Amino acid sequence: MNKSINNLQDIFLNNARKERIPVTIFLVNGVQLKGIVKGFDSFTVVLDSDGKQQLVYKHAISTVSPAKPILFNSAQVFDN
C-alpha cells in the first residue's frame, strides 16, 4: 500500500477522540463497551467509561460504533 495513504482506522479513532464522540465497542466475544476514546496505538484503545479507564486490545475488537457520524474528508485519507 502506498505510504501517502493514511490509516483509515487511525483517522476514525483520532476524530472520535478529538470530538469526544461516545462510541460502543463490540468485542469478538459479544461484550459491549461504551465510552469515550481517550487514546490508542497500534495494538490498544483506551476507553473512558463513567470515569473508569479500560485498555482494550484491538485484536479483541469486532466493531466500533460511534453515537453520531464521524466526519472526515479525502484530505485526511490522502496526503497531497
Swiss-Prot record:
Belongs to the Hfq family. NCBIfam families: Hfq, PRK00395.1. Keywords: RNA-binding, Stress response. InterPro entries: Hfq, LSM_dom_sf, Sm. The lineage of its organism: Bacteria, Bacillati, Bacillota, Clostridia, Eubacteriales. GO terms for biological process: regulation of DNA-templated transcription; regulation of RNA stability; regulation of translation, ncRNA-mediated. It comes from Clostridium perfringens (strain SM101 / Type A). RNA chaperone that binds small regulatory RNA (sRNAs) and mRNAs to facilitate mRNA translational regulation in response to envelope stress, environmental stress and changes in metabolite concentrations. Also binds with high specificity to tRNAs. Homohexamer. HAMAP family: Hfq (MF_00436). The keyword Thylakoid does not apply. This is RNA-binding protein Hfq. One of its GO terms (molecular function) is RNA binding. Coiled coil: none annotated. Residues 10-70 form the Sm domain. GO terms for cellular component: cytosol. It holds the Pfam family Hfq.
